[in-house]
């Protein structure tokens, strides 16, 4: 009472297979898998771009500090 049993889940899966067919479900599964791969790849690229941005930002702050010191000495 209250929960979904394994038999109810199996009946739901069987109905879905009958409605959509195995070919359509296979296509949907492939598309979903490719979407997840693309998302993970984009996240990995985004992390590397963030790391590069931090390096560039550190270089800019160092060069700005050096320019300030040069102006103070002049």
Swiss-Prot record:
Subcellular location: Cell inner membrane
Cited function: Part of the twin-arginine translocation (Tat) system that transports large folded proteins containing a characteristic twin-arginine motif in their signal peptide across membranes. TatA could form the protein-conducting channel of the Tat system.
One Pfam family here: TatA_B_E
Transmembrane segments: 1-21
Protein name, as recorded: Sec-independent protein translocase protein TatA
GO biological process: protein transport by the Tat complex
Provenance organism: Haemophilus ducreyi (strain 35000HP / ATCC 700724)
Superkingdom in the source lineage: Bacteria
Subunit structure: The Tat system comprises two distinct complexes: a TatABC complex, containing multiple copies of TatA, TatB and TatC subunits, and a separate TatA complex, containing only TatA subunits. Substrates initially bind to the TatABC complex, which probably triggers association of the separate TatA complex to form the active translocon.
């Amino acid at each position: 009472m209250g929960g979904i049993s394994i038999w109810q889940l199996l009946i739901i899966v069987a109905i879905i297979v009958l409605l959509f067919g195995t070919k359509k479900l296979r296509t949907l599964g492939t598309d979903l898998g490719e979407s997840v791969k693309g998302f993970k790849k984009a996240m990995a690229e985004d992390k590397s771009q963030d790391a590069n941005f931090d390096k560039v930002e550190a270089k800019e702050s160092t060069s700005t500090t050096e320019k300030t010191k040069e102006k103070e000495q002049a």
